[in-house]
């Protein structure tokens, strides 16, 4: 690790932050060209409520959002949160990468920080107009918390615990990033022949303190949202625990692999296999050096476990939940796994370092393409849904108000033609582009209905509606509209338009 900084290194750091920030701007370009709202955004732009962040166990997110708007009702100030979040994440990524002191020269020094920015699972977090800032802030603070501070042991633990408590009150998934970043720092300390066990012990103690404080204070007193409570329960001990754990592993593995379908899986398989070989080479090389055999054995055991920690940190503690949220946004620690493989390969194979640097550009560029495709898909889908709602409103206006009290959907609209190819090429986008008009899904519909001034309530779809024979009030290749006992039923089972 670097003990001092020259004026040249500070200038270099500032440039790296600027260039990394520019990469973030390029990546989010589709969000600038069109006004994109995502999921919860539709609800907040209409009612301005911010209290849900508190009941979700994220009081710091609430505080930051109301402070930014100088009001307890949160109005839309996008793209300011996204810009601020990208700047913070760029700065934290460069500072963290700098502390790794990898033997990179010139513009290749930019590579490590890009792993934290170009992360396909981060795309979903960036889509939230209201949450993007605090989600990226949580990631940034987790990286900073993993650094080995040059203080006494007590201050080190307290400072790290304080940062991690802020992480948990901002966005809980930041804990996974902390675990992954600690794995990378541990590996770098070991390569530098520095003591790793004091660092491991202090970071474990700090993480435990933060988790206990969060559980005792925040969860016990603030978390009341049914959704959060339902998805935060640990797997109960018993014969079914292993089955549930394996199901979680399968679900998260499928989510990760959906970002790298078919031959694209080589973009992660090759770096991983090379890192495994590199780690073995470094272990053999270290075992031949003079020193305490006992110390080398314990250090070697820790290093062997690091790749498994880096992989397990991707879903993190979600693996231990009985009903976890299986979503791309909880897998943002993917960045740490990718950076871990890169660090091992750069340090284990100095003879081919230039080739590794150059070839690393390929998976990073792939992630850029995937993220831009995700943003374009969501933007196009939002435009299509808005146009569809306008058509539905026009059809509803032809029905006398006294004849219709509710609305129901059968199935859901077919995908817009301009997103089908992206969904086919990148299966992960299916989990990012979440449809808002679905059968018996009142929450998703309600947030759109509020914005579009549609007063009809969405009711559950009855089996009788699907088999009803009636006269259609409107019919085309998108939907068929009919009335069923004062309920306007939109039947989307018409198939795609040709």
Question: Model-predicted segments: where are they?
Answer:
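Intrinsically disordered, polar/acidic, low-complexity terminal segments
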Residues: 2-55, 59-60, 65, 69-91, ...
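Short catalytic/ligand-binding loop motif for oxyanion handling, primarily in non-cytosolic enzymes
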Residues: 123-126, 174-177, 415-419
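Membrane-interface micro-motifs in multi-pass membrane enzymes
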Residues: 54, 58, 85, 104-149, ...
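Hydrophobic alpha-helical transmembrane segments of polytopic
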Residues: 20, 112-113, 160, 207, ...
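Transmembrane catalytic cores of multi-pass membrane glycosyltransferases
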Residues: 27-83, 89-90, 94, 129, ...
């Amino acid at each position: 690790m670097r003990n001092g900084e020259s004026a040249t290194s500070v200038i270099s750091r500032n440039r790296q932050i600027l260039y990394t920030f520019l990469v973030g701007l390029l990546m989010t370009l589709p969000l600038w060209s069109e006004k994109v709202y995502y999921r919860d955004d539709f609800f907040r732009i209409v009612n301005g409520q911010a209290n849900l962040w508190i009941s979700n166990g994220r009081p710091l997110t609430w505080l930051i959002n109301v402070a930014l708007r100088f009001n307890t009702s949160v109005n839309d100030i996008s793209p300011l949160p996204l810009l601020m979040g990208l700047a913070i994440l760029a700065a934290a990524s460069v500072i963290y990468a700098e502390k790794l002191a990898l033997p990179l020269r010139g513009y290749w020094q930019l590579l490590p920080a890009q792993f934290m920015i170009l992360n396909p699972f981060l795309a979903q977090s960036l889509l939230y107009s209201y949450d993007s800032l605090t989600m990226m802030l949580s990631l940034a603070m987790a990286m900073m918390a993993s650094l080995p501070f040059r203080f006494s042991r007590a201050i080190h633990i307290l400072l790290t615990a304080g940062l991690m408590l802020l992480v948990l009150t901002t966005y809980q998934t930041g804990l996974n990033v902390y675990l992954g970043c600690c794995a990378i720092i541990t590996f770098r300390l070991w390569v530098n022949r520095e003591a790793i066990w004091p660092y491991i012990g202090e970071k474990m103690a700090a993480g435990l303190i933060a988790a206990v404080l969060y559980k005792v204070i925040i969860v016990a007193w603030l978390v009341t949202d049914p959704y959060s409570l339902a998805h935060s329960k640990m797997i109960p001990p018993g014969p079914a625990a292993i089955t549930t754990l394996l199901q979680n592993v399968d679900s998260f593995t499928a989510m990760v692999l959906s970002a790298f379908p078919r031959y694209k899986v080589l973009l992660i398989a090759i770096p991983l296999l090379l890192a495994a070989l590199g780690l073995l080479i470094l272990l053999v090389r270290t075992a031949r050096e003079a020193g305490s055999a006992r110390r080398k054995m314990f250090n070697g055991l820790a290093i062997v476990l690091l790749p498994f920690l880096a992989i397990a940190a991707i879903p993190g503690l979600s693996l231990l939940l009985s009903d976890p949220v299986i979503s791309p946004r909880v897998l943002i620690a993917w960045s740490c796994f990718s950076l871990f493989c890169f660090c091992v390969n750069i340090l284990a194979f100095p003879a081919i370092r230039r080739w590794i640097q150059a070839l690393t550009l390929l998976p990073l560029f792939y992630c850029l393409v995937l993220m831009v495709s995700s943003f374009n898909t969501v933007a196009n889908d939002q435009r299509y849904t808005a146009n569809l709602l306008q058509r539905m409103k026009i059809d509803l206006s032809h029905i006398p108000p006294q004849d219709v009290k509710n609305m129901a959907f059968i199935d859901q609209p077919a995908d817009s033609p301009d997103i089908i190819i992206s969904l086919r090429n990148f299966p992960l986008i299916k989990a990012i582009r979440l449809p808002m008009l679905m059968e018996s899904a009142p929450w998703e519909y309600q947030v759109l209905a509020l914005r579009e001034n549609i007063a009809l309530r969405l009711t559950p779809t009855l089996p009788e509606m699907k088999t009803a024979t009636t006269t259609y009030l409107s019919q085309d290749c998108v939907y068929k509209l009919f009335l069923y006992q004062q309920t306007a039923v939109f039947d989307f089972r018409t198939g795609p338009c040709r």
